[in-house]
Amino acid sequence: TRLRIALAQINPTVGDLEGNVAKICAAYDRAEAAGCDIVGFPELAITGYPPEDLVLKPGFVADNLSALAQVAARTRHCAAVVGYVAADRDLYNAAAMCVGGEI
């Protein structure tokens, strides 16, 4: 048994959630077409790095979570590990495993 891993060297733009989702999805599609089982994305790929005070804007963290859900919905067999901003009582630099349309 083998495990084929891809590393997506995309260049996310800080604050451009829509553009970053497009970059992530394009790289994901290439990795899956190449037969990869898992593809890793950069730290905070959804928001761009560093998001700094953008995370304090009303709605930005929620929009980042919606963008992550869009990426997850595109996934099939190949898993994607995607960096995003997680929120609980505090904000966290996190990574989500997305596969089969789910986070």
How would you label these PLM feature ranges?
Residues T1-I103:
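Hydrophobic structural segments
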